[in-house]
Every structure is written in structure tokens, then in C-alpha cells.
A protein has these predicted regions:
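Sequence-level detector for tyrosine residue identity
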Residues: 27, 31, 59-60, 104, ...
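Structured beta-strand/loop patches that form or line metal/cofactor-binding pockets in enzymes
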Residues: 15-52, 57
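Active-site- and interface-proximal helix/loop "cap" or "latch" segments in soluble metabolic
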Residues: 54, 59-111
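C-terminal binding/interaction regions
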Residues: 2-23, 87-122
Length: 122
């Protein structure tokens, strides 16, 4: 049962990372940032479309591990139509629970990298 549960969680992370619907930058917005995890070398670039103080769209490109890719994908979907001042609530939501699980504690910096890049872009 433990092995099965572990595989399911890993499959969830794989599924998140493989969703690349918001992958690819447009280079049309002033809300842009790149960020690097100095511990592991993961890199991300993010671009935000913001209108009326709401994030309408997030685009990203990564050179990173699966945890950072999954986090970027998940964040890019959940940030849409979020007021800029409410972005902090997304990363602590239940949606990120699978990525912030204590058994992946050593990957927390990887998971947080897209969020940090978004904050930097603002």
C-alpha cells in the first residue's frame, strides 16, 4: 500500500509537470523575471499579463527538475484571475499540498522557485 501510494503521488507530480499549456514566453509584458535556485541550479523565467491589478495569464520557461516544472505549471493555472495582493494565498492552498509534502522537504526550494520568480516580476 505504501509503495502504491508513493507511486500515485509521483504520478500526480509527473502529470502536473507534463502539463505545458502555459509553457513558453511571449515577451510582451513588462512583468517579467528570471530566477535561479543557487542550491541546485534550477532556472525559471516568468512573464505575467496583468490587467486591473489581476493576473490574467502566467507564462513560464524552465531549465529545472520535475518539482519546479510541476510547481510552475500548477501556479500558472491557479494564478489566473487572482488579484496581485492575493498571490501569497495560492502557494499555501491545498492545491500545492502534493508538492509541499514533508517527504519532499528537500525539494521545497525547487517548488518555491516559480512563486519567487512571480514575486520578483511584480
Amino acid at each position: 500500500n505504501f509503495i502504491m501510494r508513493k507511486k500515485i503521488i509521483n504520478q500526480k507530480i509527473l502529470n502536473l509537470a507534463s502539463d505545458t499549456s502555459n509553457f513558453g514566453l511571449k515577451y510582451k509584458s513588462k512583468y517579467f523575471a528570471s530566477h535561479k535556485n543557487k542550491k541546485c541550479g534550477d532556472k525559471i523565467k516568468v512573464e505575467l499579463e496583468i490587467k486591473n491589478n489581476k493576473v490574467k495569464k502566467m507564462y513560464y520557461e524552465t531549465e529545472s527538475c520535475i518539482f519546479c516544472q510541476a510547481s510552475a505549471s500548477l501556479l500558472s493555472k491557479n494564478i489566473q484571475n487572482t488579484f496581485v495582493e492575493n498571490i501569497d494565498k495560492i502557494i499555501t492552498s491545498k492545491r500545492f499540498k502534493v508538492l509541499l509534502d514533508k517527504k519532499y522537504l528537500s525539494r521545497k526550494d525547487c517548488v518555491m522557485l516559480p512563486y519567487q520568480a512571480v514575486k520578483k516580476a511584480l
